[in-house]
Amino acid sequence: DDVGGSATNLINHDEPEDIYEIVRKEAEKGMVLDNNPDFTLWGSGGCLSRALVKRPVMTTPYGATLYGMRDQIHEELKKQLDKGTVFPGIDSGTDLWPHCKYLAIHIYEAIGRVVVSSRKGMKWLQDVAKASNKLKRPIYWTLPTGFVVKQKYIRSVVKQIKTIINGRMASLFAGSSDAEKMHNFRQVNGIAPNFVHSLDACHLMKTVVSAKDNHGIESFSVVHDSFGTHACDIEQLGIVLRETFVDLYKEDILEKFMNEQGDLDLPNLPEYGNLNIEDVKDAEFFFS
């Protein structure tokens, strides 16, 4: 996806791109066109901040829903009001929920316009999970490193037990699970983030192995998809990161995933964008 890839610095730019700011501007543009008289402060009023947009954008790969985004925006808006941020027409007695719902709708739509292919890919993975649920099957996939991932969320049951302890009534909660009953909702909601995280882990492993075996780098500091090493090796690590990323994604990862799903009745693969994955090697701000 060349649009989403550009917004996330997968191609070279003179300055780093900021996907949160890109989505903010896109949402603001949509609200200006909408011109709803009850919410003009967010569009033409220019009050939509980057902070209000950040969490909805960050949690989109984790299956964030419209309602979830509304709640995130409500939490952030209250935080900003508590700090003393002034929003024209909003005071301590204002019902924030209509504003949050309106913002969530436009931010959700703006994200879809900025990361077009990512959202299509996420929906396709969720459709695969739904098809797997119909056959009551876990989902398996094999990473390029050979590691086999199994996703199987078990449905658990929590029972409340009332009893007397030291002469007083107490409530205890006991949980149990049935290994044969999958949690269908979690299977669907978890597939996209789990798939992405598995590829992040694969990229990490390939990077560390290549950096050590080919360049003698033995010290690493890693948190999720954040990579670090000593200052003397940081430039070389940046090169290795780009090389292993391209090596990982030049394969058709989704097609390989689809072929591992056996006899499931699957939807067609989503249409791919025009990003040239080799451009990552020249993307200055891919790793910084």
PLM regions and their residue ranges:
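Conserved catalytic core of nucleotide polymerization and phosphodiester-bond processing enzymes
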Residues: 1-288
